[in-house]
């Protein structure tokens, strides 16, 4: 045997058969229940080999063979009366006269009785149970006979060649589930242990990547894992999908799929052994219907991989369905919670254990969690369950271990001739046949036609709209259930062959028209899409509208044609008419001009209305603000009383100004003009109206709510802040000696009939409104008279810079005034002029004001004349500029200013006029109050 040693472990392998002799060893099952049985048989075709067997005392070995009776009897005697050595081991002694030929015949099998010898009735199922329960640690106690105790004799070359042929034709059968019996040959336990240790060390040093080493590493990793995230190994028989291409699996279910090997050749370690499965390291796996994905990273993206866009990285491609987003979900390991989690990114969500999860939510993943994205379901598998399954079936580990040891022993002894097997027919493995993965055929791109391949009549796009195409297609090919999108596409290609050759893209326009055009409706649902049909009612209504519109268009066209014919007929009659046509043309031109003027007038009227409305709003706002300012001191009156007072005061003011302007024949908005030109006097009118309304509302309890003196002072101060002083020209006047104060007081007391002088300072003077609405008169040159009548006081202060008028002087002018009618008229002129844009009131205040109320009549008259002469030109210019807007005439000087002494008759005339104006104003105020009360 060339000094080699072979140990054959009986599993589910069928031994080689010899054509001449047949030997079978049947071991009683009762002998295997108490202790382990090991047999070691070393065969050599031409040499005598001593056989040592360690058997229990109760073991029975029955040998059946077709040989002479004397040989069988000798062997039976040896078995019945075993010979033991010094250590108590059984020893089989062979006679010296047993030659080589007789020994070889003893080991040959008979092919005729092969099936009878291995009858399944002789081995029961309970016989194999003790063997299956043998611990893995006992497998390492296999002992091998020593090399020195084996007698090796030369081998006959002829027989060696014959044995090689027999070995080459031997069929090795591998089974999925193994029931093995450990048999070994042992001569001496200490010697065998030492030999096993040497052999084991030799095999480890020879190949560190053998299958036993890998299996040991797997077992150690399973125990060391302890629920960590270390990738676990998946065995191929545990998977659902197709095995990888670099793995080789064997189906052990039938005898037809057995593999034949030459026993003389060494087994290549790179090739997988029968029943060996490839190992895949992964954290988890995703089981789909047609494939399996191994999660080998802590983060995996699930989605739809685009054919054209490679920017989106997808680890698990779920197909081209548009219901799946490019990045639909992600599986990641959460170190905080210590588990895998699923986060939904796609807008359509996903189902996790038949529960819908919306976009943006994250759910934990457990073992065997069912997930469905779109129409694709799959299962999440964790390796812990796989480890538990492995621990539940230790017999599988025993079988794998015994098989690996058998392979290693075969490698050491390739020329074994005899194999002793036990047991009945092993069960066939129930492994599923490997299902080849059917790859989806790649999407065939549409053929791009060249211009020569397209027929000439189909090279241009039809002028029909998509809605018309769809209507024609659906009416021609539609059924009662409707048409799907693919059917509509096919129908359009059939009706309009242009779309057979044109590139894709028109389908989106078709879908757009189907969804937005009301002529098409969804009839029924089929699968994921809808079947489309026509809305005949809507189409009929559209047809009626189109027909009506066409009729109207035809009527308009006929009317236009008739009008054109009439114009042509008139043109033909032009020579007959002659001059009449020329006159008519001129009249048409005049009419056109008139129309233009009317249009411009209308535009001006509209602009005037806008300006009037804006002026009214501005005036009312100003009046309201001033009323609020005037009534800050409410003197304990309630809000209701103050509101009534303000309402009546506002009505009185508007009514007084409007009535005065109406009596004078002035049009426009006099209140706005007064506010723009003289706001100080408007404030005085408001103050007087507030006092009158207070006395009326409170029924005399409160006679005066506003002090006119403080009102005038505040108004002048506000005007002085905003106005700029105007330099007046220097006027040379003759020197007039100053009058003593006694004369001034005498002249002031010489007019006891002065209306304004005798009136109380807190009362309202209705006649003050008439000063602003005097009729326009031609300005007269009074410069010479004014130059001769300037008092000495004015000549002394003429070179001084103009200053704002003091509040007390203004009050004296507005309330007390002068003692004559001429002084009152001149005073009204001075006050109206002081409200102009030039701020002349502030400039002339120094000349017109006096230090006491006893100023003489002549002095006051001369001062007023001087002021009127200075401001005459300015007033005339302002009147011209504002005449178109406000229609407010300027206040010209009174003719009586030329005379320093006024007769009593003129004074009485002025008094009568003032009385009449006051009566009219009072009547107007009453009417306004009544109308306001009705409105409120």
Swiss-Prot record:
Residues 139-150, 384-395, 864-911 have a biased composition (Basic and acidic residues). Residues 460-552 bind DNA. Residues 1-90, 139-169, 243-270, 384-442, 718-936 are annotated as: Disordered. Keywords: DNA-binding, Nucleus, Phosphoprotein, Transcription, Transcription regulation. The modification Phosphothreonine is found at residues 230, 247. It is found in: Nucleus. PROSITE patterns: FHA_DOMAIN, FORK_HEAD_1, FORK_HEAD_2, FORK_HEAD_3. Residues 779-795, 815-853 have a biased composition (Low complexity). Residues 9-29, 243-257, 742-753, 765-777 have a biased composition (Polar residues). Residues 416-430 have a biased composition (Basic residues). The modification Phosphoserine is found at residues 44, 228, 264. It holds the Pfam family Forkhead. Residues 854-863 have a biased composition (Acidic residues). The keyword Glycoprotein does not apply. Residues 300-357 form the FHA domain. Present with 639 molecules/cell in log phase SD medium. Acts as a transcriptional regulator that recruits coactivator IFH1 to the promoters of ribosomal protein genes. Recruited to ribosomal gene promoters by RAP1. This is Pre-rRNA-processing protein FHL1. It comes from Saccharomyces cerevisiae (strain ATCC 204508 / S288c) (Baker's yeast). The lineage of its organism: Eukaryota, Fungi, Dikarya, Ascomycota, Saccharomycotina. The gene is FHL1.
């Amino acid at each position: 045997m060339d000094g080699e040693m072979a140990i054959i472990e009986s599993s589910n392998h069928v031994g080689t058969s010899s054509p001449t002799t047949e030997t079978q060893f049947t071991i009683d099952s009762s002998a295997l229940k108490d202790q382990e049985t090991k047999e070691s048989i070393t065969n050599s075709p031409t040499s005598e080999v001593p056989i040592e067997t360690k058997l229990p005392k109760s073991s029975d070995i029955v040998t059946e063979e077709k040989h002479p009776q004397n040989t069988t009897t000798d062997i039976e005697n040896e078995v019945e009366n075993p010979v033991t050595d010094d250590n108590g081991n059984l020893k089989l002694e062979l006679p010296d006269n047993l030659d080589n030929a007789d020994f070889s015949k003893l080991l040959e099998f008979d092919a005729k009785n092969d099936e009878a010898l291995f009858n399944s009735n002789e081995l029961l199922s309970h016989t194999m149970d003790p063997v299956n329960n043998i611990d893995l640690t006992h497998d390492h106690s296999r002992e091998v006979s020593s090399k020195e105790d084996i007698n090796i004799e030369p081998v006959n070359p002829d027989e060696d060649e014959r044995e090689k042929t027999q070995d080459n034709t031997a069929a090795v059968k591998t089974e999925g589930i193994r029931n093995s019996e450990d048999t070994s040959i042992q001569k001496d336990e200490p010697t065998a242990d030492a030999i096993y240790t040497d052999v084991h060390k030799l095999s480890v040093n020879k190949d560190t990547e053998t299958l036993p080493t890998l299996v040991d590493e797997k077992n150690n990793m399973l125990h060391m894992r302890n629920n960590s995230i270390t990738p676990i190994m998946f065995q191929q028989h545990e998977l659902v999908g197709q095995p990888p291409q670099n793995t080789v699996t064997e189906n052990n279910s039938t005898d037809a799929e057995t593999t034949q090997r030459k026993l003389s050749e060494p087994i290549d370690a790179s090739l997988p052994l029968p029943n060996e499965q490839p190992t895949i390291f992964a954290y988890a796996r995703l089981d789909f219907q047609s494939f399996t994905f191994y999660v080998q990273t802590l983060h995996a993206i699930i989605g739809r991989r685009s054919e054209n866009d490679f920017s989106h990285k997808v680890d698990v491609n779920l197909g081209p369905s548009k219901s799946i987003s490019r990045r639909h979900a992600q599986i990641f390991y959460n170190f905080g919670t210590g588990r895998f989690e699923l986060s939904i990114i796609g807008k359509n969500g996903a189902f996790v254990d038949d529960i819908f999860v919306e976009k943006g939510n994250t759910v934990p993943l457990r073992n065997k969690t069912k997930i469905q994205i779109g129409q694709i379901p799959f299962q999440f598998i964790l390796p812990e369950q796989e480890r538990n399954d492995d621990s539940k079936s230790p017999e599988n580990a025993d079988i794998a271990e015994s098989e690996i040891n058998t392979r290693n022993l075969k490698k050491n002894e390739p020329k074994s001739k005899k194999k002793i097997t036990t047991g009945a027919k092993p069960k066939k493995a129930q492994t599923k046949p490997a299902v080849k993965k059917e790859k989806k055929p790649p999407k065939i791109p549409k053929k791009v036609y060249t211009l020569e391949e397209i027929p000439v009549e189909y090279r241009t796009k039809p002028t029909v709209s998509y809605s018309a195409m769809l209507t024609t297609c659906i009416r021609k090919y539609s059924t009662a259930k409707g048409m799907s999108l693919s059917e509509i596409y096919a129908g359009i290609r059939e009706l309009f062959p242009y779309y057979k050759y044109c590139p894709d893209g028109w389908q989106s326009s078709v879908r757009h028209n189907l969804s937005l055009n009301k002529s098409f409706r969804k009839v029924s649902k089929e699968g994921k899409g809808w079947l489309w049909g026509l809305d005949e009612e809507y189409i009929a209504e559209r047809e009626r509208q189109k027909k009506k519109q066409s009729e109207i268009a035809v009527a308009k066209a006929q009317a236009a044609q008739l009008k054109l014919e009439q114009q042509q007929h008139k043109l033909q009659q032009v020579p007959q008419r002659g001059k009449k046509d020329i006159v008519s043309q001129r009249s048409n031109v005049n009419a056109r001009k008139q129309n233009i003027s009317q249009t411009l007038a209308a535009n001006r009227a509209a602009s005037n209305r806008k300006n009037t409305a804006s002026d009214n709003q501005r005036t009312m706002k100003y009046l309201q603000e001033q009323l609020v300012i005037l009534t800050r001191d409410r003197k304990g009156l309630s809000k209701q009383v103050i509101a009534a007072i303000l309402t009546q005061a506002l009505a009185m003011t508007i009514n007084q100004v409007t009535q005065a302007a109406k009596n004078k024949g002035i049009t426009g908005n006099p209140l706005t003009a007064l506010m723009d030109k003289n706001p100080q006097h408007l404030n005085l009118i408001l103050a007087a109206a507030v006092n009158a309304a207070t006395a009326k509302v409170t029924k005399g309890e409160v006679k005066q709510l506003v002090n006119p003196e403080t009102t005038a002072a505040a108004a002048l101060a506000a005007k002085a802040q905003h106005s700029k002083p105007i330099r007046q020209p220097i006027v040379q006047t003759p020197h007039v000696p100053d009058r003593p104060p006694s004369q001034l007081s005498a002249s002031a007391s010489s007019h006891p009939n002065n209306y304004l002088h005798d009136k109380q300072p807190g009362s309202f003077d209705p006649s003050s409104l008439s000063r602003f609405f005097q009729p326009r008169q031609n300005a007269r040159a009074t410069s010479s008279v004014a130059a001769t009548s300037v008092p000495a006081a004015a000549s002394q202060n003429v070179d001084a810079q103009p200053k704002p008028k003091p509040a007390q002087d203004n009050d004296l002018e507005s309330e007390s005034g002068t003692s004559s009618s001429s002084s009152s008229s001149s005073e009204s002129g001075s006050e109206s002029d002081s409200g102009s844009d030039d701020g002349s009131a502030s400039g002339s205040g120094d000349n017109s004001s006096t230090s006491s109320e006893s100023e003489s009549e002549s002095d006051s008259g001369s001062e007023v004349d001087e002021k009127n002469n200075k401001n005459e030109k300015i007033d005339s210019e302002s009147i011209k500029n504002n005449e178109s807007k406000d229609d407010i005439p300027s206040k010209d000087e009174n003719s009586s200013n030329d005379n320093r002494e006024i007769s009593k008759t003129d004074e009485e005339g002025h008094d009568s006029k003032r009385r009449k104006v006051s009566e009219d104003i009072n009547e107007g105020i009453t009417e306004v109050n009544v109308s306001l009360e009705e409105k409120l």
